[in-house]
Amino acid sequence: MARKTPIERYRNIGISAHIDAGKTTTTERILFYTGVNHKIGEVHDGAATMDWMEQEQERGITITSAATTTFWKGMSLQFPEHRFNIIDTPGHVDFTVEVERSMRVLDGAVMVYCAVGGVQPQSETVWRQATKYKVPRLAFVNKMDRQGANFFRVVEQMQTRLRANPIPVVVPIGAEDGFEGVVDLLKMKAIIWDEASQGMKFEYGDIPAGLESVAQEWREKMVEAAAEASEELMNKYLEEGELSEEEIIGGLRTRTLNCEIQPMLCGTAFKNKGVQRMLDAVIELLPSPIDVPPITGEEDGQPAIRPASDEAPFSALAFKLMNDPYVGQLTFFRAYSGVVSSGDTVLNSVKDKKERIGRIVQMHANDRKEIDEVRAGDIAAAIGLKDVTTGETLCAVDAPIILERMEFPEPVIHVAVEPKTKADQEKMGIALGRLAREDPSFRVRTDEESGQTIISGMGELHLEIIVDRMKREFGVEANVGAPQVAYRETITKTVTDVDGKHVKQSGGKGQYGHCVITLEPSGEGKGYQFFDEIKGGVIPREFIPSVDKGIQNTLNNGILAGFPVVDVTVRLTFGSYHDVDSSQIAFELAGSMAFKEAMRRASPVILEPMMAVEVETPEEYMGDVMGDLSRRRGIVQGMDDDGLGGKKVRAEVPLAEMFGYSTDLRSATQGRATYSMEFKHYSEAPRNVAEAVMAARK
């Protein structure tokens, strides 16, 4: 079957923004103008097409990136038909992993900013991710009709906060209630959209009288930016002082693809103005799959590349798993090279397992359309893959390749969950297993000490939504505990010649076990060590492992507060036995008694987990962030510039002090700082902390 749309007319784009910039509304308008939606879904009435999980419609925020395919021929039908694969990405900081994941499979992105709020914190995080993956991008300043809307302030914020190089290709006509349309700086004409047709129709007009000088000034900046794309263009511009429309678009395109500039547009998605011109800019200025470097990977341990061509062997990256109530698991994948048809067998090269692709569907938000094949550059979902996890490679069986893996952050918050009823127990295990497969930043484990199920994620909202999804999608009701800290106990000095004697000789078969031990600290991270130093057979060989076993049984229950004991060395130095009454159990008990007594004498202490915390913050909040970390008993270990005009602070902070940190950090920095943390090591808890912990366990 021949390709319907040539690959150079594909645009795989993400739409990315801070929570309230109006991204979902913008996506809705795109679907409307490109002819997919007949009735525009508004977010405020919970009808948006892309936000299809129930929680999203209730909360009015986007949690899962849905992928949608649509087509565009231009506002004036001036282009051949182009195919857009649009990935809608979440804007909440707890879902950053979703954004990171979609950045891997996009070729270009549209960053949506609010004309009032401007560049907000998550915009900075998303910008960093797009820079990391070298994603070319456009900026769309939305909500131009709102009180306080100011396009040029957003241009300035992009320069200062993001260190970006924004180049407006339109300027607004009016603002707030007076926002009427835009001046297209390429054509130097005003574009006014017709409200009666919901913006489907428009007309070009003359630039309003007071705007000519502003438009002229920004046009010159745009033409200069385009001229810098090549020596040829620069020479022509210097000689003639002007470039043709084709040359300007060509120059801007080259520099956008190299991530040197970010063309800017504006409008109001809600009032149906401006999105249409932005779609034209996606065709003119963002890359097709063949305009970006070919995907790289490993073939037999050697670096390999796969060009975006139907002739190359098939390779694809699974970037998202979703459960569909009707067809089961959907595996979203981006095909980088080759062709795959439904019914084909492919290789999951990460697990070295073959999988059969059952059916292939292309998604429009929550609707599915079955297709027969997927070609290089396309995005679709497969039904029927058994054992594929996010970030794994699917490829031709005879041409294995592992595409670069995605990196996911370690979860930073843990809570215990318990099913409300016995019936929920088994269902909860299945539900959590499925959710963990879908979302690599969410983990599940069983705590060996308490036997509880512990779930970990990227933030409090993340875990709330997981618990919510268990209830809605799997019908599992769960109680959620308060976040917990895993303390430990150890000793701080060496004690020698500690006796443990278990004697019971009052008629009948007696019991006799006697050992003498030395207990010493073994150093951080060394764990438990046992040395047999018995000489002259004072304890027979067969009883020595029993002493060790008795001590190990006691390790799980320290003498201060019942926490596990770590990093101790036991030397068995002396003892005695009875020919008839000695037994393995008697020596186990003797070992346990000796160890408990030795612990008491060896100055035991409580250890708490210390976390390596890294905070990225704009410079103006530096003082607040540092002050807050030291209030949390944190030790600042270094500071760097983050390359975006902000600072990176590295500190070591006890886990016990980090609960609620994401919320506190967000409010202290108006949400502009982000942080990550991971376990570093155990360290002795200060006396007041240890006393409080011990009191809480009594």
Curated annotation (Swiss-Prot):
One of its GO terms (cellular component) is cytoplasm. GTP binds at residues 17-24, 88-92, 142-145. It is found in: Cytoplasm. Keywords: Cytoplasm, Elongation factor, GTP-binding, Nucleotide-binding, Protein biosynthesis. GO terms for biological process: ribosome disassembly. Pfam families: EFG_C, EFG_III, EFG_IV, GTP_EFTU, GTP_EFTU_D2. One of its GO terms (molecular function) is guanosine tetraphosphate binding. Transmembrane segments: none annotated. Residues 8-290 form the tr-type G domain. The keyword RNA-binding does not apply. CDD domains: EF-G (cd01886), EFG_III (cd16262), EFG_mtEFG1_IV (cd01434), EFG_mtEFG_C (cd03713), EFG_mtEFG_II (cd04088). The keyword Nucleotide-binding applies. Catalyzes the GTP-dependent ribosomal translocation step during translation elongation. During this step, the ribosome changes from the pre-translocational (PRE) to the post-translocational (POST) state as the newly formed A-site-bound peptidyl-tRNA and P-site-bound deacylated tRNA move to the P and E sites, respectively. Catalyzes the coordinated movement of the two tRNA molecules, the mRNA and conformational changes in the ribosome. Belongs to the TRAFAC class translation factor GTPase superfamily. Classic translation factor GTPase family. EF-G/EF-2 subfamily. HAMAP family: EF_G_EF_2_B. This is Elongation factor G. The lineage of its organism: Bacteria, Pseudomonadati, Pseudomonadota, Betaproteobacteria, Neisseriales. The gene is fusA.
